[in-house]
Amino acid sequence: MDALFHLRDMIASLDVPLTDDLCARARLPRNDDLYALNGAAAPAPEELAGAYAGSTTLAGRVLLLRPFYVRAVLPALCAPGGGAAERNACIAADTACLNSLARRLALSIHVATRKREALPDALQTALGTGDPARVENAITNLSVEAGVLARVEARARKNGADADTVRRLAVLYADVLIPLSRKIQVHGLLAEA
């Protein structure tokens, strides 16, 4: 499991720029006029996880994440509003967030590989069923996730984020980003099974 701990350290190091970028974006309004998705809904997390795990380039992953980012991340992070004055700042902040998010989620694929190599009994049993929910339950480590949330909150406070932004970031991680990361891992594990 040493390789898995090393990957968790790498993820922690990627949470720093992601948290910094999300804090910077949270200071700006959502500015919905910037996002032409042509009515495209955000993909379901399972669908996004499969497509994401199958993509091999940062640019391809950013393209896959964009509808999810616009439909799930921005509303959870930013207040509505905005206009021409913030346009360039919003675009730059969105680009930074998408790149940081794509890098952070890319390590989920490697975490799945390491978990598969370690193959604890609970994971082996879950993989044998082929049930994504059981596999997700087997790989979930609540103490690790609590550590991620504490780290994100501390980094957000260090960035000078107000209490509401710290709370929104923690909720975004807990309800959106960590579950998506798990689903990417599940997809990778079941694809290899």
Region locations from a protein language model:
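Extended amphipathic alpha-helical regions
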Residues: 1-193
